[in-house]
Amino acid sequence: MKFTVEREHLLKPLQQVSGPLGGRPTLPILGNLLLQVADGTLSLTGTDLEMEMVARVALVQPHEPGATTVPARKFFDICRGLPEGAEIAVQLEGDRMLVRSGRSRFSLSTLPAADFPNLDDWQSEVEFTLPQATMKRLIEATQFSMAHQDVRYYLNGMLFETEGEELRLSLIHISEPTR
């Protein structure tokens, strides 16, 4: 695997896919990002096993296909620390990923891409498509009553229900006796 990309084209997608990764992952591979180069595109994937985020970056310079995983935080910090407009050259050599930009050189340990959890194997029972503005409006109208740090973890989310052509978002309201 080998690719070159401009810092600005890589930084925002890196930040987005690093979002789901917690500070102390339960498995070492969950602290890594999956990098895949194929068909002129770099795909970056991060997961915490509950949520997966994928970002894609178009590669305009010559590249070689391949896949690996790298420590997310280290890779992001390296890219963020480089000057604006810097070109970042990345090359996989054995179990190390070499990152070069200008006179800077970094070597990151990798884990095999085959070990990265694949949430694509999960099959949904229901699929639906709706405009982003409609989805945003539904969430905003419901999220005010969502718990954020309740020990009853099932209250820390939103329920999406479908019935026929109807999508319903709901939250559970628990009445607790006052003393």
Map each language-model feature to its residues.
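Hydrophobic heptad-repeat coiled-coil signature
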Residues: P177-R179
